[in-house]
C-alpha cells in the first residue's frame, strides 16, 4: 500500500501526504483483511518527503521503494520466514524483517 499505514488508507495517498506537509512518506506491505488497508503490517519502506517535489517525482521515488521491498518480502513469504498467526505477523529467527517495527512519523 502506498502509505505508511495506518496513515492514509485508501486512495490518493501521495497527494494527502503532500497536502498535509508530512515529513516522511512511504509504503506498507501488509496482509489483506476485511478492513480497508487494516491488515497486519509485514514491512514498511520510508523516504523523506521533499515538499518541493512534484507529485510525479514523489510517485517515482515511491515506486523505487516498492520495487526494492516487494521482492524481498515475497522471498521471505516463499521461504516461510514470515507468516501470520492469530492475526499477528510472525517472523522466523533469520528473517531480515524480524526486528522491524511499524514506522511512525508525526
Task: Please place each PLM-identified region on the residue numbering.
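Short, basic/aromatic-enriched C-terminal tail that caps enzymatic domains
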Residues: 86-106
Amino acid at each position: 500500500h502506498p502509505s505508511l499505514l495506518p496513515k492514509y488508507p485508501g486512495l490518493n495517498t501521495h497527494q494527502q501526504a503532500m497536502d498535509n506537509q508530512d515529513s516522511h512518506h512511504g509504503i506498507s506491505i501488509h496482509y489483506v483483511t476485511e478492513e480497508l488497508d487494516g491488515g497486519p503490517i509485514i514491512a514498511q519502506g520510508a523516504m523523506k518527503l521533499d515538499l518541493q517535489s512534484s507529485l510525479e517525482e514523489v510517485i517515482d521515488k515511491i515506486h523505487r521503494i516498492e520495487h526494492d521491498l516487494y521482492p524481498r518480502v515475497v522471498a521471505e513469504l516463499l521461504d516461510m520466514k514470515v507468516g501470520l498467526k492469530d492475526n499477528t505477523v510472525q517472523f522466523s529467527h533469520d528473517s531480515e524483517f524480524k526486528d522491524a517495527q511499524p514506522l511512525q512519523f508525526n
